[in-house]
Structure formats: structure tokens, C-alpha cells
Amino acid sequence: MNRENVNKDTPLYPGMQPDLKVEVAIIGAGTSGLYTAFRLVTDNKYKGNEVQIFDMSDRLGGRLESVVMPGMNFWGELGGMRYLTSQEIVTTLIEGYPLKEQDLNKRTPVLKDKMTPIPFHMGEPEKLLMYIRKERFKQNAWTEEQKHDNKLITRYYLNEEDEGFSSDQLFNKIIYNVLMADSWVAETYKELIIADPNGYDYTFKLTSRDWDAIKPRLIYNFPGSPYDKRLVNDIGFWNLIKDQVSQEGYEFLANAGGYYSNTINWNSAEAFPYMVGDFSADTTYKTIEEGYDSIAYAVANAYMEHEGARIWSENKLITFTKDHHLPHTHKYELTLLNIQSNTTWKVYANSLVLGMPRKSLELLDQNNFFFDASKQEKLNENIRSIIMEPAFKILMGFERPWWRDLDIHSGHSITDLPMRQCYYFGTDDETKNSMLLGSYGDMETETFWKALSDDKVLFKVKAAKSASLEALHKLDDVQATQFMVNELMNQLRELHGDSVDIPEPYVTYFRDWTDDPYGAGYHAWKAGFSVKEVMPYMRKPLADEQIHIIGEAYSDQQGWVEGAFCEAEKMLQTHFKLDWPYWLDREYYLGW
């Protein structure tokens, strides 16, 4: 395992410097905040000491966190874990430019840290499991039946015309039918929205630009429906799915799709491109061999190379005001709490960039001039235009890759049990120690796991090959509860069946992203909000203030690092007048 390529010992400064004066104060050392600092100083807009980052955590990266478990020589992911090669900012920063050059060795790197892009293996559907309503299938069972002109009948009472469709196919069928029922869409994009003659498959060749043209004006044309003639943007996704394929069809999609978060009652117009994904030519999922949080460290290191650059860790923003004694030189006075000393101190800045999701914004002083609900009604409404989606992750270390007994090597299995899915992450070639991710990032299961994760008795680590108790005990405070491990093992055994003997884990690693200050693992737009208007609004909510809100939460790629990068880039170009990055393809579409 290479720990040399990416420097993850980026210096963090947990101290304080009362009355510090800066041009730009960035709150949040997640990907959007780090990217903003990197661009402002490398573009020579400001010097390093004029742009400072503050974060209440003792680490950087926000909701990216890669860890190595004792006895294993590879990284596991507690947060975001992959990117799509169609996401050009993140791909270029990781792989170099130009992206049109297929040979990665011939590309020019943007950042000094050398990240190694590797495929994010989705596994083989003919081996991976789907366990729903107490029936066990291989994930390709639907398409296998279709090859023989049969329909796979499950224990879901689907409408007759929907029987035999896999969950992916049924999602696509719904989206196809709604798009084609709008005569303008059907006429304008008929070459790009294709139904396969086999009756099950649909192909969408729509670009992000196409979707942005479609989303605000797509009409739901289904006479007799409660939602007939309404904008799809104003219909909840659950409402729409039930209307198209019945409540039982909805249950099938919610369970077999693997994520309840995809089928919550969020904005249908935003859900469509999210569900279809970017299937433009050669788009693949990748990750970084050095851990996916390497992208955060590499961007941070590029900023930190500049003299005076600093990331103030363990410093929490409490409030900010314009009413202070230095209004002639600095617009805002920030009050920060230094966590180690438990004392407050002041920072003065002319621009404020809040690289924060909804919950973090709500934890700031809601009575200051910016958030004051009686005066800033529109801002408060728009802050609440997104749904916070809970996400728990639990990594488990086993002394052998027991899933190989089922001929499974990578990918994930899906179930309607509260665990929802598990990813088979990797195996150390020497020790055979192996990692599994139990990921229940979901709305409906949150209370099930919360009752278990709140218990006081934590899992006790056990020594394993090349994993000393001393090394393992360092992870004592991040163990899942014994309750949770017991329940998860019970569900893993039910999901995989009697044909495999599943041993107990020797170590776990638990992260609940619902905890403050994140409040959620990712976010989703509510139905009825004009996303086209809210996105640019959030990047500068008040016309006469230099205060900007960025991050994945209010982006059109929620849950992706690219969403955070695109919002930061648009904010920088519009409000800081930065030029288009020299390393980014000029044709790349950044969205609204």
C-alpha cells in the first residue's frame, strides 16, 4: 500500500490569533472550502495569508474519510467513495489534463500529490445477491428470464404490464413514459430517448445541458391522474412512482433499488437525471488507490504551499456581524470558538464563504443579520429547500474473505432487511484479512439502527494476523456497539443464506454522518422549489453582502464531490471574477 504518493499530514493549526485580519474567511475544510482556497491563491487573486480556512473538526475533508484498518494494506471508505469520469473537475484534478488524452501517463497533472485512479468494481451481477421478501435471487435473474422470453415473478404484486422488469428497468420505464408523454420533450429529444425493441430496456443519451432544458418545463401528461398537467418539478418522486406503477411497484423499486434515499418524496425533475445517471460514452466509476479522501488532501496541500496559508482546525464559527469597530477596512467580524481552550476570538474579513450543508448553517447564530428569519425570509426558505438524508456506515474487518465461498469478489448485495446493502471491499493478499462495508444510508432504517447505535456497550476488538491488540485498541472509540454488530451479523447471515459460514469480525469502524455538524450524509431537493433559481441564489444570497454558500447540498449533483466543486467554481467565476481554470475543458458544463 502506497502512503508516499499523497501527503495526508497536511498541517492543521488548532490555535488562535485574536483580531486576525483576512480578505476571505472560508468556513469548512470540506471539498468546496478547500477548492475555493486553492483556486483563489493559485489564480493569484489573493496571497495565502489573505485566504484562511476554519473548521470545527480536527481533520480536513468533511464527508470524505478514508481509513486503514489494522491488518489490512488498503483503504476503506467511511464517507464518499467514488467518482464518475464524466465529472470533469474531480476527474481532471485526480487524473490530469486533457481528459481527451486516453493515456493517463501523457496527461499533465494539476496537483503535486500523485493520486492513482483505479476502477470502482461493481462486481458481477450473476454472482451478487438480491434478497427481498425472503426470496434470494442473483442480481441478473430478471435479465436471464427475459433472454428466454420469461418474466421473473417475485413476491411483489406488480401491475401486469410491469411484471418481469428489474428495478433499474422499471425506473427507466417510468422516466421514459413521463418524458415521452410531454409532446415538446418527445419531439425535441426523440433521437436521445430510446426504447429497446425487447420491451424492457431504455437508453437516455441526454446530456446535463439537455436535462437542464427539460427539468423546469417538463409537464406530467396523464389524464385521470391526480397530478395531470402539473410540472414534474412540483411532484414528489414517491407520488409520481405510485401514480405510474402503484404503491406495490413503489415498494419493489424502493427495496430492490438498494437505496430508500432514491425513492423518498423528493423533487421528481431532479430525480430523473439522478436515477438515469450519466451514460455518455465510456463513463465509468473510479476511486483512488490512496483512499478517496486523497482528493481533499491534494487540494489542501496545493493551497498550503502558499506562504501564510493556514487551516485553523478545531475552531468553530459561532456568529458574524457587520456591527464592529473596524468597518472601514473589514466588512465582517467573525466570532470563533477555539475548542481546545474553550475561548472565543475575533477574525475580520471582507468576504465570507460558507462551505457548509444545511444542518451546519442551522447551527450558526440564527439571530444575526444574515439568518434573521423576520428579515431574511427568502434565505430561510431556500436553506430549507433540501431534505437531509441520514447515512450510517460501518466497516467490518474479517480474518478471511468469506464471500469468496459464494464466488463473490467485489460489488454489493442488496436486501430489504434494514441493512439494505453491503459492499465487499477488499482483501489483503498476505494476511487474507478482508473488509466489508455495511452501509445503511437511509431514511426509513434510521430509527432501527439509532436504537442500537445509542447503546453503551461497544464491540470488543480481537487480535488478528498482522493486527496487534495495541493497534486495534486505538480504534476502541470508533467501534460500533455490540448490539449493532450482533444485529448486522444476523442480517448478513440471512442475506447470504446457509451455504456460507460467516465468521465474527475482529474489528469494526462506525460513522454516523447524521451527527452534528453534518446532519446528513447527503441531500435531496424538495419538490416545488425552482432549483434553477435556488442554486445561484445560495451562492450569493444577499445582493449587497459578500457572503457565499457552497457545497454539495445546494448543487445539482447532491452526494457527489463534483457537486461541491461545481458550486465553488461557479461562485468563484461569478463573484470573485476568476478566469476559467486552464486545466478544465472549456466545453464542460457546470450547471445552473
Descriptions of predicted regions:
Residues 1-24, 42-48, 591-592:
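Extreme N-terminal leader/targeting segments of oxidoreductases
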Residues 2-11, 406-592:
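Conserved flavin/dinucleotide-binding core of flavoenzymes
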Residues 28-32:
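Glycine-rich Rossmann-fold phosphate-binding loop(s) that bind the pyrophosphate
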Residues 41-70:
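Glycine-rich FAD pyrophosphate-binding loop
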Residues 72-118:
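Conserved FAD-binding subdomain of flavin-dependent enzymes
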Residues 106-262:
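Mobile amphipathic helical/loop "lid" adjacent to a hydrophobic cofactor/ligand pocket
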Residues 190, 194-319, 323-331, 335, ...:
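Active-site/ligand-binding neighborhood in enzyme catalytic cores
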Residues 313-447:
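Mid-domain catalytic core of redox enzymes
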